[in-house]
């Protein structure tokens, strides 16, 4: 995301493609008790915007690269969310995350980072959540036996062209990592049929 023109093209497409799944996410996860959301690698804020629309007392912090944050402010301003969304313009893998968060979202993040970082970020999310807080992981996922679905596999392959050391994450593998860290109430839902899944869980109160 260091090239401004490429970042703009990618972010515009990603924003449009995330608004629909954002509505689905609102139906699947109850954030009515949460007051703070950390959107890690949240791009231009499409998911945050949808979650804040559905939860009036929620405010969001998005961590993403500075040029992505600059593009995101356009969408956040159009959604009239400038007083409820803030950016930490930085690399989510290296910057410090705010603690005591009511919810943490990582959407399309794991498919675009080195696979060795995934377990560490799961542990860091647990650390940064308040007791009872929700973790939401949305991404391209193939079945545990890797037999499909074809579109999810193709999208994962496309991402690996840009991040060769990314990991092809499966729901079962991810559920095991969450359980090892200490998450409870681990659930799996389909977000975009045949393409993406949502794994969500809760930190014990």
What label would you give each PLM region?
Residues 36, 40-205:
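Alpha-helical subdomain
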Residues 1-35:
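Conserved Class I S-adenosyl-L-methionine-dependent methyltransferase catalytic core
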